[in-house]
Amino acid sequence: IHKSAICEPLQGENAWSYAEKLKLAISSIRDHMFSEFIFCDDAKLNEIEENIWIARNIRHAMEIGELFLVYQPIVDINTRAILGAEALCRWVSAERGIISPLKFITIAEDIGFINELGYQIIKTAMGEFRHFSQRASLKDDFLLHINVSPWQLNEPHFHERFTTIMKENGLKANSLCVEITETVIERINEHFYLNIEQLRKQGVRISICLLYTSPSPRD
C-alpha cells in the first residue's frame, strides 16, 4: 500500500523545519492502515513529536527516577472501608512536566519496553507495600492491585518471575491482585492463559483494568 503524508508549510518556515515536520508525519503512517493520505496540521505534528520524544526518553526517565508510583485507595462505597490500593505509574519530566500514563504506557507497549518497565513497577510496588505493611496495621484482606500489560502475560515465565518477586518481599499471594490492562488484550497467546491460571492457583486475584483507572475484580 502506497501512502502519502501532506504537510502544509507555514509562512516564513524554513526548509529544515519543514523537512523535520515531513519526517514526523511519515513516521506516523504506520498507525493509519486504511488511509491513502494523511494530512498533518501543527496539532497533529506536535502530537507525533511528543510521541517520538516519549519513546526516546522513557528508559532514561525510569533510570533517573522520573517514573514513580502513587497509590489510589480502593474504598467500599457502603462502609467506606479501605479495601486495598492500586499502584499507578506516573511520570513527571524535568523537561516536559507531567506525561499522561495513557500515553507513555501505550508507547512503551508499542516500542517493546513494556516488559522492562512492567517488572520495575512490580518490584517497586511490592517493595513499597512490604515497607508500608511493616509500619501500618492492615487487615488480612487488604489487596495491592498492580497493573500488568497483556504483553507481560504473553511472556512464557511471567508467573515465575512474579512469584519470585513476591517471595523476595515476603508477601502472600492472597494480598495481591493483578490488574490486566485492556490496551492490547486481543493480542494474547497461549502463555497469557497459562500465566493467569498459575497465578490464580497460588491465590493471586485477577481483574480487568479499564483504561488504567477503575478495577473490576473477576474471581
PLM segments and residue spans:
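GGDEF/GGEEF active-site signature
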Residues: 1-6, 133, 160-164
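PAS and PAS-like sensory/regulatory domains
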Residues: 1-3, 67, 85, 142-144, ...
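C-di-GMP signaling machinery
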Residues: 10-68, 78, 108-112, 150-159, ...
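Active-site core of bacterial EAL-family cyclic-dinucleotide phosphodiesterase domains
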Residues: 42-107, 147, 179, 208
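Active-site-proximal loop/turn and secondary-structure-junction residues that shape catalytic pockets
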Residues: 75, 150-152, 182-184
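Conserved acetyl-CoA pyrophosphate-binding loop and the N-cap/start of the following alpha-helix
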Residues: 113, 117
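Helix C-cap/alpha-to-beta connector motif
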Residues: 120-148, 164-175, 198-202
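The catalytic core of metal-dependent phosphodiesterases that act on cyclic dinucleotides
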Residues: 163-214, 218
